[in-house]
C-alpha cells in the first residue's frame, strides 16, 4: 500500500486511475459501488466503538461511504490536496464552506465575476445569518485590499470566471487574504486539477462542481472541496450533520470521469482555441472572451498559472439578436 504522499509522486494519469481504490475481499478490478444506507458490525462492541469515534469505520452513508471515499481520495491526489470532501452539488460544496467558517458578524469579499447562484447564496441566504458580503471586480487588487476588514474571513473567486473567462492573480489574492488571517477560496470548476491547482498557488480551499468537467458527460450532480486536513475536517462536519452528501452511485460516475479527464480537457482546450480564433475573425462578432487569445487581458496570467486555457468561449455579436443565433443552432 502507498500513502497519499507516495501517490503524489505519480503522474496525473496514474493518479486518475489508481488512487483511492480499496479492493473488497472479492478482489474486483474496477471500483465497486456500495449502494447502502448503513453498515453492519460483528458485535455490539464494534458498533459502539465506531459510533463513538474510538475506531474509524463506516456507520451511515450520509457520513462516509467506501465509494465516495474512493472519489475523495482520487480527487485530493490529483489536486495536490491533503483531503477532499464530496458533496451533492457544486453549490452544496460552497454552502458547506460557508457554514463551516462563517458566523454572524463575519465578512466575505466575493468577486463580481461568479456564477449567478453564488451571488444569490451570499445576498439572499448567507446574509440572513448576519454575514456581510462585499462584491468587487476580480482584477482590481486595490478594491480587494480596500474591502478588507478585521472581520473578513473569506475571499471567494472563480478563475477562470463564468462566463467571461476573467483570470485572477491567485498568488496575490492569497497574499491579501493571509495578511489579515482570512482564507482564499477558489472555484476551479472550469479548469479542473488538470489545468490548474490553486492550492499550489496559495489558495486555502478549492471548490468544484463535479457536475461539469469532472463527470464530463452530463450524467450526475456533485461537488467537492479540497484542502488541508484541518480545514476539511470542519467542512466534513457540516456535510455529515446537514446532509449535502454525495451519493455512492454519483461518486462512481465521477470516478469513471476522472479516468479520462486529462484527455478530455486537452481536447476541450484545442477545440475552444480553434473556435475562439474563428469567431475572432468573423465579421459579425464584436468581441470574443477566451484567455487563449493573445489580446485577452488575462492571457499572460493564464499562461503562467494554468496548463491550458480551458474549454469555455464567450462572444458578443455586432447586430444579430440572441434568438437569431440560438434558433438555427442544432446539437451535433
Model-derived regions, located:
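Short, solvent-exposed beta-strand edge segments and adjacent coil->beta transition regions
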Residues: 55, 220, 308-312
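Single conserved hydrophobic/aromatic residue that forms the stacking wall/gate
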Residues: 323-324, 328-332
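Conserved N-terminal alpha-helix of the aminotransferase class I/II PLP-enzyme fold
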Residues: 43-92, 117-124
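Conserved PLP-enzyme active-site core in the AAT-like
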Residues: 3-8, 16-25, 83-284, 289, ...
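Adenylate-forming
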Residues: 75, 93, 108, 324-325
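N-terminal "arm"/small-domain region of PLP-dependent enzymes with the aminotransferase-like
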Residues: 2-65, 73
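Conserved glycine-rich beta-strand-loop-beta hairpin in the small C-terminal domain of fold type I
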Residues: 30, 273, 289-314
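Short hydrophobic/aromatic beta-strand micro-patches
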Residues: 226, 314-316
